[in-house]
Amino acid sequence: LKRMWFSNGIYHHYGCEKFVPDFSSDYLRMVIDHTDKSLIPLKDNETMDRFCDEIFPVMFEASVLPKRVNKADKQDLVTTSACNYYENVTQAEVEKFYNDMKDEADESMPSYGLNSKLVKRDGSIVECKWTENGMYGPAISHIIYWLEKARNEAENEQQKKVISILTEYYRTGDLRTFDRFSIEWLKETEGRVDFINGFIEVYGDPLGLKASWEGFVSYKDIEATRRAQTISDNAQWFEDNSPIDPRFKKKEVKGVIANVVCAAMLGGDEYPSSAIGINLPNADWIRARYGSKSVTIGNLTEAYDQAAMGNGFNEEFVIDASM
């Protein structure tokens, strides 16, 4: 149960390998048979036998959907991955669908596919957008509700503007609105409180297109940020003197913001296994024009350091610590 909680499911949170239960399928069926049937998430007209026939192989057979994200060569990465971003489509179909959307002449092209599930229905491929009135609508409505509450408590007008654009994005699903949000988010540097909220990282998609949701609220560590800012203020010097080919050096380094923050709240894919640093946004064209925010999460870094130190139990009480 702890492994499932920590990994948000039956796949390792980092390696993506499936782990199977230590109890048997017969035991689980016995437990289900003694459970109030109204608590079992059956589909319309689905029988208990059909329900078990569908989920038991995925849970108990190591060879069935063995990886959440498969990156192996010469395999269809979509059909062999257990992620829930695609349904009844192949890797080739996904790639063609999104390649057809792209306009290489568009220098501010959005991250197509970031906030949707791709599904083939009746022979046609459609995007199911994650919006207030689309897929996951009830959950997204709650996100909008609390964002609007937060807007009333914002520290400055720029924060209010950022939150307003984000709620617009959740309502429409328009990825260009999300890019506009990201740009305005970069401009907000005066407040002590900052946040991340949205479909951000694409590690859970074998094709690197679709993002998982995460939420993160933080506040600045003033003294540690002062030290970090000294480095970022001299970013051009580091760029000019870096030991790389001059062809790859930027003549003008833009928008480097380095803060040390304390995490106040973690949610979604950011929890319970959290990063200790964040550098956003991910869109290359936004980073090139407007820069990025680079954040070290001080209290989590300290927690990892403390955990790595151990508690001295082995050294004190075990003759051979390697045992």
Please identify what each model-predicted range represents.
Residues M4-S322:
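Contiguous, non-catalytic segments that form substrate-binding/exosite surfaces or channel walls
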